[in-house]
Amino acid sequence: MERQSRVMSEKDEYQFQHQGAVELLVFNFLLILTILTIWLFKNHRFRFLHETGGAMVYGLIMGLILRYATAPTDIESGTVYDCVKLTFSPSTLLVNITDQVYEYKYKREISQHNINPHQGNAILEKMTFDPEIFFNVLLPPIIFHAGYSLKKRHFFQNLGSILTYAFLGTAISCIVIGLIMYGFVKAMIHAGQLKNGDFHFTDCLFFGSLMSATDPVTVLAIFHELHVDPDLYTLLFGESVLNDAVAIVLTYSISIYSPKENPNAFDAAAFFQSVGNFLGIFAGSFAMGSAYAIITALLTKFTKLCEFPMLETGLFFLLSWSAFLSAEAAGLTGIVAVLFCGVTQAHYTYNNLSSDSKIRTKQLFEFMNFLAENVIFCYMGLALFTFQNHIFNALFILGAFLAIFVARACNIYPLSFLLNLGRKQKIPWNFQHMMMFSGLRGAIAFALAIRNTESQPKQMMFTTTLLLVFFTVWVFGGGTTPMLTWLQIRVGVDLDENLKEDPSSQHQEANNLDKNMTKAESARLFRMWYSFDHKYLKPILTHSGPPLTTTLPEWCGPISRLLTSPQAYGEQLKEDDVECIVNQDELAINYQEQASSPCSPPARLGLDQKASPQTPGKENIYEGDLGLGGYELKLEQTLGQSQLN
């Protein structure tokens, strides 16, 4: 008997390993098909179905095959055994079965309605991912790549609008979706489709927070291929990047909302506690990600890792990943931390990397982003058939479709109207219509929904989220090109050309600045930050910028010499790069270092304003909603700076 049980155990273990290999083989096969399909689409300029939509189609087909072509097994019989001596759920449990001791580990709590009295399907159960895989493995490279590849010039040019859409717009979407869904839930209770008390207002707000996470990856990919107007691209890209971070923290804050008396009633103290949690988690995650990027910048600056590009790239990757893990370990949000880590790495650390490491890091995270995105979208297709606890409710699904469109309209149009009151370059109606159209749901909404599917309301949310992702990716993603034509939005704009950092073009832009942009207070704040960053942060963290011996007081001489790299002194003689900073009085050329660098001819900087007409299609680096007021610019020498654009 003992031998038989041991043989059965070894057989079960072999079967488990076999199922794991099948699971990996399925995803490997799906990715191969997706890559070949992407090549086919790009070769034939087929834009009505994007690669993400194709990945979902392949996932659906594979899920359909696994669902109906595999036989059910007895490994999940649904039988419940009572342990009357246990009063809690231990993390590890030793069970004596016929004098044979077995070890079991805690997996999750299961609601009564999730216990299936019939046979289960081992393959389908195996194909259902642990939700933490999405947050700990697949999402971090996607979010980091978004921050690391950020086009900083256009992003900061529209920073005010992006922050407004990301923070205020996400809050508006969450509230509007929550209110509409609460009305539909009441209708479902009245129709007898739900029991009173099964679905609370906090559940509706939770659904609103996860559905407020937009992910227009399909639209942005088409924008990039068609070279759509850079302002529209930046508004959508910037909103989606920050919106993901805000939605994740907002979802967590709502999930821990717990009034003292009635758990489903409004409690002002609990509400403000949730707001405080939101602000604290967001700020802490921002600080954590930025801190790791600063550590990476200092290590790459003061060591000679640049002589070993492989080690340099490895250190860069591991420290960036550590930002995510440290934030999660500290009870913060790793997604927010890794986003701002990527932005800070691009702004500082990238300048210290060797040329090989610059190429390797960009290609590494681009590749990881590509694989992770396609794995997620393939799994979305699979999940429609492999997830065994779907709850389809037509009224709830109809309400969700209506809610996301109304919420998107309440987000885009009123906020655009308010922003246009302070912007010189208005957000035109066709841009607003395109932003309304581009409110797709994707990886973040799906990952938030699948993270908790134990209760019936959460299962209904997950099923509805999955259908919404399918619809928006296929319909809106496929209709992007016709919509661009119908709205007469310009395409064929070379975004990279607009982002080139050459002295003559920047000086031409500076000579043609409009003096009446937006409010002067914003300009003063931005000018203070830029000056502080240029004079102190970049010289401390990178090899670029003026030597600290010229910017810090004399009594800081030892610290200045310690923190200033030898390259900064060498680059002090060069005038290869000119960068614009704000000056309140007049537009002038600053030659503070000219005494030590007599080889810098003024004519090379283009002092004759008449000889520097503005190049058509060039946008002013600072024009937008940062609020420069009537201030003008001053050109200051930047010492050998190399930025990631």
UniProtKB/Swiss-Prot annotation:
Residues 594-622 are annotated as: Disordered. The gene is SLC9A9. Residues 42-45, 148-164, 225-235, 299-301, 344-364, 408-429, 487-645 are cytoplasmic. GO terms for cellular component: early endosome; early endosome membrane; early phagosome; late endosome membrane; phagocytic vesicle membrane; plasma membrane; recycling endosome; recycling endosome membrane. Belongs to the monovalent cation:proton antiporter 1 (CPA1) transporter (TC 2.A.36) family. Ubiquitously expressed in all tissues tested. Expressed at highest levels in heart and skeletal muscle, followed by placenta, kidney, and liver. Expressed in the brain, in the medulla and spinal cord. Gene3D superfamilies: 6.10.140.1330. One of its GO terms (molecular function) is potassium:proton antiporter activity. Changing residue 438 to P: Normal protein expression. Fails to alkalinize endosomal lumen. Does not affect endosomal localization. The keyword Zinc-finger does not apply. It is found in: Late endosome membrane; Early endosome membrane; Recycling endosome membrane; Cell membrane. Induction: Conditioned medium from iron-depleted astrocytes increases SLC9A9 levels in human blood-brain barrier endothelial cells (hBMVECs). Homodimer; phosphatidylinositol-4,5-bisphosphate (PIP2) and phosphatidylinositol 3,4,5-trisphosphate (PIP3) could be involved in the dimer stabilization. Interacts (via the C-terminus) with RACK1. Interacts with CHP1. This is Sodium/hydrogen exchanger 9. Endosomal Na(+), K(+)/H(+) antiporter. Mediates the electroneutral exchange of endosomal luminal H(+) for a cytosolic Na(+) or K(+). By facilitating proton efflux, SLC9A9 counteracts the acidity generated by vacuolar (V)-ATPase, thereby limiting luminal acidification. Regulates organellar pH and consequently, e.g., endosome maturation and endocytic trafficking of plasma membrane receptors and neurotransporters. Promotes the recycling of transferrin receptors back to the cell surface to facilitate additional iron uptake in the brain. Glycans are attached at residue 96.
